[in-house]
A protein has these predicted regions:
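N-terminal secretory signal peptides
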Residues: 1-22
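N-terminal export signals
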Residues: 19-46
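N-terminal cap/lid segment of alpha/beta-hydrolase-fold proteins
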Residues: 45-74
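Short beta-strand element of the alpha/beta-hydrolase
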Residues: 79-87
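Alpha/beta-hydrolase active-site loop
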Residues: 129-151
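Primarily recognizes the serine-hydrolase "nucleophile elbow" in alpha/beta-hydrolase
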Residues: 147-152, 156-199
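Short beta-strand/loop motif that positions the catalytic acidic residue
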Residues: 206-208
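C-terminal catalytic histidine-bearing segment of alpha/beta-hydrolase fold enzymes
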Residues: 230-275
Length: 275
């Protein structure tokens, strides 16, 4: 689903969002609120957000395996739910922070850990972890967590999926494997046939970069044609003059304006279909 060219990581050399020492200390203590982009840009803030707002969950799959993740709860329930799927690196504090942000917006948000606690420090490690994941086991993990969210005692029963890069492809895979109410894909692999898309029942929102050489116009165009052939008309594809991983504030490909626009569209999409 990913390779070292498109998903390889180079740290951002852009100026970080301004935050004072006082704001930083207050946020880490859970006494202040900062914009999501600011939290994601600072590892210490992302770590604090994930630690303060999420708790681990572990659920047995039908085959006897384990589906793991971290859940963030909203103040008001019952609430709709969102399943977040990480990039090829593994589950990190940034994704946990996004889960915390969704909880602030009124969702039960669960960030899945598809690698069972492992996290890659470089592209070679990420590729190894990705290749070690059995597709059948990965699908079972996600279906198990989606079913768990639907039946959670504080859930309305509605579920949306969202993923980035590796997770974007898995967001689509999960929605094909089991019914959900909304699917969001950030520059994920979408090379599916009409037959493979036959069981997809949710509306789909996709975010893609025109400079992305892997998840490119040919692949996305083929996806649009396959969706049409399968009779799936509720698809919104958005293009940004940006590269792969443009929504990751810690990477060199980060595009602040496009990331903000994609996030605005994502939250509006979930509000429309889940709330």
């Amino acid at each position: 689903m990913c390779d070292e060219v498109s998903c390889g990581y180079t740290p951002s050399d852009k100026p970080l969002p301004e935050v004072t020492d006082g704001q930083r200390r207050s946020f880490i203590k859970g006494l202040a609120v900062l914009p999501l982009a600011t939290v994601l840009a600072y590892p210490e803030l992302a770590k604090a957000s994930g630690h303060n707002s999420t708790t681990p969950v572990s659920i047995k799959t039908p085959s006897g395996g384990t589906a793991m993740g971290y859940i963030a709860m909203p103040d008001v329930t019952p609430a709709p739910t969102v399943l977040l799927i990480h990039e090829w690196w593994g589950l990190n504090d940034q994704i946990k922070s996004v889960a915390a942000e969704f909880a602030k917006q009124g969702y039960i948000a669960l960030a899945v850990d598809m690698y069972g606690g492992e996290y890659a420090a470089d592209s070679a490690g990420a590729k190894k972890l990705m290749n070690q994941l059995d597709p059948k086991a990965g699908t079972e993990q996600l279906v198990t967590l989606i079913d768990w969210l639907k039946n959670h005692e504080k859930s309305t029963g509605k579920v949306g999926t969202i993923g980035w890069c590796f997770g974007g492809g898995w967001s689509l895979n999960a929605s094909i494997a089991t019914p959900v109410d909304a699917t969001v894909i950030y520059y994920g692999r979408v090379n599916k046939t009409a037959d493979e898309l036959a069981s997809l029942n949710s509306p789909v929102l996709g975010h893609f970069g025109t400079l992305d050489k892997n998840i490119n116009a040919d692949m996305v165009g083929g996806f649009e044609k396959a969706m049409a052939a399968a009779g799936k008309t509720d698809l919104s594809v958005n293009w940004y003059e940006a590269n792969h991983a443009f929504a990751n504030p810690t990477g060199a490909r980060y595009d602040e304006a496009d990331a903000a626009l994609a996030w605005e569209r994502t939250t509006a999409f979930f509000k429309k279909h889940l709330m």
